[in-house]
Amino acid sequence: MDTRVTIITGPIGSGKSTALKYIKEKGFATTDLDSISNNILESQSSFEFLEANFSECLVQNKIDKKLLAEVVFTNQDKLNNLENYLHPLVTLQVATLIQQTTNHLFIEASAPKNIHQLYPTVVIFAEEPIRRKRLQSRGMSITDIDNRITTQPKESWWKSLGIVIENTSYTELHAQIEKLLDLSYE
């Protein structure tokens, strides 16, 4: 297990991005798998896959991420197809990034698949009512929130992945991250 890398994960709306932003502000290297995935999907090399499998999500030959989300979060087969396409490509880019990194790297993974087996993992967690409220404040519809939460694993699975940080407030999240960084990475 490569201890130069830590995975930051958790269910939607739990505060992964907030945690990663705070870690970055503390001077650590960070990246997130969603950005890597989006870059892959927007690349010309993905066009053939998208045209064959998600043509309804192409607008002027470019992927419409909102349409894609509507499709994959209401159709498990489509979600699996997209994940099976992206997973090896993302894994390759992450491996390259890790090779180029000399210091500790924190990687946000919203859908961790098997990456949590390769690196120490920190789960940012918040109870579902809190997550729903956060997602609504971002402008997500109740239907979209329901669709996304339904496709995600249950609480027990998330909490089995590694160290759990309960995110009840910004102050508490920052305090727990500080403690983690002090214990592990300095």
Predicted features and spans:
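Walker A/P-loop
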Residues: 17
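P-loop (Walker A) phosphate-binding loop of NTP-binding proteins
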Residues: 11, 23
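ATP-binding Walker
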Residues: 14
